[in-house]
Regions:
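Ser/Thr-centric signal marking residues that sit
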Residues: 16, 38, 72
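Short hydrophobic/aromatic beta-strand micro-patches
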Residues: 2-4, 69-71
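Short glycine-/small-residue motifs
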Residues: 112-115
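Conserved active-site tyrosine of GNAT-family acetyltransferases
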Residues: 11-16, 82, 107-110
Length: 123
């Protein structure tokens, strides 16, 4: 997955600092982050516009087309840390009927980020 971002340094600070992802590679306006199971790439809006030979609009905050989700050990702690680091909160930690505790924040470019923790239920 490639996320289009306005400011690569700001996005890297969020994803490496606040979410703890490891920088795998950076070259100019492009970077890859190691999520553990896969890679998340970041590419600046201006560079992607040049690649596609078109102007790209920023995503609308009230109409997300997708979310980026990460599993964490403790949603409450991760949510508190993300908000303390400046991530705008969207939904506070909530137990979901599908067996997870989830919370949502926005990254510096307005992308919806979900953090999820599996709940252990007795059978």
């Amino acid at each position: 997955m490639i996320l289009i971002v306005e400011d690569l340094d700001r996005a890297l600070h969020f994803y490496t600092g606040a979410l703890g992802l490891r920088l795998g590679h950076r070259s100019g306006d492009y970077a890859q982050l190691d999520t553990g199971a896969t890679r998340l790439a970041l590419y600046t809006r201006s560079a992607m516009g040049k690649t596609l030979d078109m102007s790209l609009d920023a995503p609308a905050a009230n109409a997300p087309g997708f979310e980026v989700g990460f599993k964490v050990a403790d949603v409450d702690a991760a949510f508190s840390e993300l908000v303390a680091r400046g991530a705008p909160p969207v939904v506070s930690p909530t137990d979901r009927f599908w067996g997870q505790r989830t919370a949502y924040v926005r990254d510096p470019d307005g992308h919806l980020v979900e953090i999820a923790q599996d709940l252990h239920r007795s059978r």
